[in-house]
Amino acid sequence: MRVLIFSFITFISISFGQSSMDKVTHQLDRLFDQTGPGEELLVWVFFADKGDATRQYFEKPTTVVSEKSLKRRAKVLSEDKLVLQTDLPVNQFYIEKVQALGFKVKQKSKWFNGISGWATKQELLNISQLQYVKELDIVYKFKKEYAVEEDKEDNQTKINQNPNNLNKINSFNYGPSLTQLNLITIPDVHDLGYTGAGVTICMMDAGFDLLSHQVFGSMNIIATWDFVNGDPNVENHGDLGNGSHGTSTLSLIGGFYEGQLIGPAFGADFILAKTENTESETPVEEDNWIAALEWADSIGVDVTSTSLSYTDFDPPYQGYTWQDMDGNTARITIGADLAVKLGIFVVNSAGNYGYDPNHNTLGAPADGDSVIAVGSVTSGGGRSSFSSVGPTVDGRIKPDLMAQGSYNYVACNWFTSCYSDNGSGTSWSCPMVAGAAALILEVDPNLTPMELRDLLRNTASQSTNPDNLYGWGIINTYAAVQSLLTTVDDNVVPEDFVILRNYPNPFNPTTKIQFEVPVQSDVRIILHDVLGREMKEVFHNEVKAGMHEFILDGSELSSGVYLLRMLTENIQKTIKISLLK
């Protein structure tokens, strides 16, 4: 039988006189007492430093992180400190020496300067005697708490931010997904032409089955990795788990199939990380989740969405308690906060543990001070009974924000046109908020995670009176976007080619098209039908750097959805527009 453990190696130097048992954490030492001679344990081995050969990485930053990651970090870090010690790889010499003592490597963590893997008690004691080994600790494992289903008849109405919008003619036919989107004013933002274009989102879940589903037909997936099995296939097909949960969360944030389901950020780019083995009683192993987050950072993601939330461990492991929800105890919380410091907007489910009058019911890493903890409301705006509550042990308000998580309309993995509204949980509300964040970042890519957090809080339904049931309330994406559009400086030279928006949208018969270029450029804008077939050129001119606009006349066009594609020498951007006569 294998048991899970984590060997931890930090940057602090080790004295020669330190006892090897001093390097073994109390939790691991207790596990040693319950372990047989040949029983393998899953542990982290943490190192004292990263060795001497580190200068090369600071001189050539792209050897450890992508250009996109460096650009994102420039929003929050000084130019001379875009690469940190935590970006440097774990010392390969150290790894090989540990392997020579019998250690079987599972994951590597450059942020925590350690490796996880399997070894016996005696092998671990031998490893602890190495001078450059700092600490050995267990790898924590988590269960997932699923929401208790509620009555679908929802008479509880706390807020309706768009009372007339359900009868409005929108740019797209949202089908049954309109209600969950309308609650957080997503259709109004789509009507402005924003779809999440240019934003990269990392989805971390238990796998993503049936990516051939019709709702993913136009999704741009740029990278995938299975951190459970160590391969790029994130669809399960019976491979250590069931990926139906990931299918649903991915459809909620970025699916697109008119008349059925549209996600907030269907125009974004996605990377998919499988981090959970649902065939296990404790499917979430923290080393997989941390490795996925580091991978996402190195690629250059802007937003992460994950439904991880702790619960009690199986014996002989100890679990976290509500008293550990202080933002500084759980390793996954520490990792999530570090990601935010690197410029990533980290969105996490608050948890499905409901209300307790005596203490919080949060799950790590939602307790992080920089992590956006998302709770759940019903379609009428009332808090879902299963939605976890704060405050954190150190007194901070949690959750941060709310969106619908009760009976959302999602894609399912039974067949390629399968949809369902039977599920509930903060796993559903989390991708709704993450998708809204992507829309806002499309409007202003220079927003830092904390600026984006404050913007969402300040425009939410309880912005002036937050509490530990709803946080700052149900997000109002349109209000957040409008607050940015009213403060845009048209004299600022843009950093990238962007079609900002068309307004009004839908239109009849004319609409204003606005775009921007960073340098003098030859710009062509071409009208296509919804299938991508070219219809006519509507703009072609040499323009100076800055903001430009023109009026598109649709008098000769039929009602429907069209694509506008802007082309320059090296860049192309596309938006959807809707003509309603």
Where does each model-flagged region fall?
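Active-site-adjacent substrate-recognition loops and nearby beta-strands
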Residues: 286-289, 313-321, 348-371, 375-398, ...
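Bacterial Sec-dependent N-terminal signal peptides
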Residues: 1-21
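Short acidic, glycine-rich surface-loop motifs adjacent to enzyme active sites
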Residues: 296-325, 349
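C-terminal outer-membrane/trafficking sorting elements
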Residues: 6, 11, 493-503, 507-581
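N-terminal domain-start motif of subtilase-like serine proteases
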Residues: 20-37, 106-109, 119, 123-124, ...
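Hydrolase catalytic cores
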Residues: 271-277, 302, 405-470
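Inhibitory N-terminal propeptides of secreted protease zymogens
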Residues: 19-157
